[in-house]
Amino acid sequence: MSEHDPTLPDRPIFRTQGAPGSTLSLLLLLLFSLANTGMAATVDSLEPLPASEWSYDHAAHLLERAGFGGTPEEIARFAAMTPEAAVDLIVNYEQIADTLPPFEHSGIWDEAMLADVDLHLRFDDVMAKAAEVGEVYGEVVREEGPRKLQDITDALYYKYLSSNREWQRVAQWWAERMLTSPRPLEEKMTLFWHGHFATEELKNDDYRLMLQQNMTLRQLATSDMNSLLIAMSKDPAMLLYLDNRLNVKGHANENYAREILELFSLGIGNYTENDIKEAARAFTGWRNQGLTFIDDRAQHDEGMKTVFGQTGNWDGEDVVDLILQQEAAGEFIAGKIYRFFVREEISEQMLDELAARLRDDNYAIKPFLRALFLSQDFYSEPSLGTQIKSPVQFLVSTYRKLGLERIPGTPYFPAATNLLGQALGNPPNVKGWDGGRAWLNPSTILLRNNLIGHLLFPETAAGAYPRFAYSTRYSNAPAEARQRDRDE
């Protein structure tokens, strides 16, 4: 058992003489890849990795995939354990106290101003309501003048702006949790479910809904698919995002029914259009009032519905039960979790075995992850150093490797990940982020390179970009002096 990786230095890496580009390239290589020498685990095998083969490199791989990486000291600590002990410590994180502070609201979202507002309304709805009743958002339509709705427009813009600003603070708070949590799998799974049950703050314009959803996903991170699907079907942020407030008896809106079948549970080709229509009827009357789920029985369709060939007076919870009776659910969910934690390519044999295991355990997530993290396939050569990290994983894991205890103020985390293609709380659409190679293009590769350069060589970066200056020595020095320092 290796307690120390001989490829890692015993002291910090300092910049040496020579071409800075070469040094940076070497460090980038170290950051982007993992050593995989001496690892001969079997591909497509769910048999546990033998304790005799467990090593420092295996421990590093586990921490990287099940969390956001670790420092050499953390890796060595896990390498000194047995594989079972290491995996159990990560998976059974409830045994570790969550000592991180809750989100602290700034107060920019004025509860008093918006107390009597229908927060479901979009801009056009607000204008129509104002014209109809003469006031909205506590503001009265002006009786005369060219801009009769200006006060209402101002209130609407305040709602949008205050929610957006506060959500940026939530994203920063969440990034701090990813970096510092003693329960890294909890945050990794929260990130996974955020991409799976994609919801947009910019559409909902209410950061509180998104924060509440984030906390729900964290609470149920390794629970089971039945609990998760029901929770998200009743989640105010999700209901608002997919327009289920418009899904009422006699006028079913199919948005949520379509997405729960296509994107959240079964995948395309495993349901019919009639299944969507009938499932939509089952979800009628499910809406929210602010942060509260409402089951409006007056708007629920009590008629008989046929979903997946089974007929009954189904409601939303019944539909979730029917979904999980389909074999395709096991394949869809097992495959998505596998691709997130292991690698993009999965054999038919492995998918069938994982799906069967998930179904046999009633779609429980924790035992599924434990089996995955212990498996030889997880540590096999095709699984090592082949994952293209999302921008969030890329930044957080880099900070963890550098031993940072706080997310730096510069670059600003929400802005940096947004530039790299991943804005927490605002996936591109209900499908979430494509991931994999989609994270990389000429622009994002250059941005990743520059970001790493800025982190590793802040003084060099300050010389090139004075607005990120770390000292007056570099921000004020003439260009030739900065160049002379580089050459020394």
Stretches with model-predicted labels:
Residues 36-40:
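Sec/Tat signal peptide C-region and signal peptidase I cleavage site
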